Amino acid sequence: MATVEVEQVTPVAVENVEVPTKTVEETVVETEVTQQPEESVPAVTEQKSEAPIVETNEEVVVEEAEKKDEETEKKTEEKDEKTEVITETPVVEEEEKKAEEVTETPAVVEEEKKTEVVEEKQTEVAAAEEVAVEKAEE
């Protein structure tokens, strides 16, 4: 809690001061009361017609509030579904592409290695044959 300091100011007492008093004269005005109720009755009915008052039960109010809540929940769920569809689709496609790349790359590398090994063997065999031919010629 906060503490609040308050300074009290006391007015200085003034001596021998006369305070003038105002005199008010009340005037009595007599009016005819018989015409006023007739005019005020239509005014009251006009107010009722402009803004009718409807009595409601607590159950009705609760039901209306629940309906509004359900409508807002449905709207938010629809928005969530739309955003989920948008975000899920690209992620799934990227994962599939990565999986394909991973599976294709080792297969291609292995095939290239196999072809290189075969080519090396062929060159070695050819070189060995050339050496054998040269030795035979000598």
UniProtKB/Swiss-Prot annotation:
Residues 64-85, 110-122 have a biased composition (Basic and acidic residues). Keywords: Abscisic acid signaling pathway, Calcium, Cytoplasm, Repeat. Residues 31-41 have a biased composition (Low complexity). Induction: Levels follow a circadian cycle with higher levels during the night and lower levels in light phases. Accumulates in darkness within 24 hours, but repressed by light and the product of photosynthesis (e.g. sucrose). Induced by sucrose depletion, but activated by glucose, mannitol or sorbitol. Triggered by gibberellic acid (GA) and salt stresses (e.g. NaCl and KCl). Suppressed by a high concentration of calcium Ca(2+) and of other metal ions, including magnesium, cadmium, manganese, nickel and zinc. Up-regulated by cold treatment (e.g. transfert from 22 to 4 degrees Celsius). Residues 31-122 are annotated as: Disordered. Predominantly expressed in roots (e.g. in endodermis in the stele) and stems, to a lower extent in shoots, flowers and siliques, and, at low levels, in leaves. GO terms for cellular component: cytosol; extracellular region. The keyword ATP-binding does not apply. The keyword NADP does not apply. One of its GO terms (biological process) is response to metal ion. Sequence repeats lie at residues 62-68, 71-75, 92-98, 109-114, 118-122, 131-135. Its main location: cytoplasm. Residues 62-135 are annotated as: 6 X 5 AA approximate repeats of V-E-E-K-K. It is found in: Cytoplasm, Cytosol. Binds calcium Ca(2+) and may act as a signal mediator to buffer Ca(2+). This is Cytosolic calcium-binding protein 2. It comes from Arabidopsis thaliana.
